[in-house]
């Protein structure tokens, strides 16, 4: 939506402030490129943050495995494991 409004509003601004047709074309082209690059930067920032999350999984694999354990299902067996290990 932002890009559509820019394309509708920018020619009006360009025609009111430009000296010639070539200046109008150049100004519209520059503004359109600027909008496109801003949109691409926003999208790349979102993609970079999600890529970091996926790449973080390797160093923390053991930690994530511990987090995935269903502690409510495992908790009843903890006293048995402690007794067994303590008998050595």
Curated annotation (Swiss-Prot):
Residues 1-18 form the signal peptide. Keywords: Amidation, Antibiotic, Antimicrobial, Immunity, Innate immunity, Membrane, Secreted, Signal, Target cell membrane, Target membrane. Its main location: secreted. One of its GO terms (cellular component) is extracellular region. Disulfide bonds: none annotated. It is found in: Secreted; Target cell membrane. The modification Valine amide is found at residue 85. Expressed in entodermal epithelium along the body column. Residues 19-57 form a propeptide. Antimicrobial peptide with a broad-spectrum antimicrobial activity. Shows very strong bactericidal activity against B.megaterium (MBC=0.1 uM), E.coli (MBC=0.2 uM), S.aureus (MBC=0.4 uM), methicillin-resistant S.aureus (MRSA) (MBC=0.4-0.8 uM), vancomycin-resistant enterococci (VRE) (E.faecalis (MBC=1.6 uM), and E.faecium (MBC=0.4-0.8 uM)), and extended-spectrum beta-lactamase (ESBL)-producing enterobacteriaceae strains (K.pneumoniae (MBC=0.4-0.8 uM), E.coli (MBC=0.2-0.4 uM)). Belongs to the arminin family. This is Arminin 1a.
């Amino acid at each position: 939506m932002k890009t559509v409004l820019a394309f509708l509003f920018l020619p009006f601004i360009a025609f009111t402030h430009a000296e010639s047709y070539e200046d109008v074309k150049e100004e519209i082209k520059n503004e359109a490129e600027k909008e496109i690059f801003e949109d691409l930067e926003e999208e790349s920032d979102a993609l970079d943050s999600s890529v970091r999350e996926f790449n973080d999984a390797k160093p923390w694999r053991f930690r994530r495995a511990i987090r995935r354990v269903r502690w409510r299902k495992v908790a009843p067996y903890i006293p048995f494991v402690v007794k067994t290990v303590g008998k050595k």
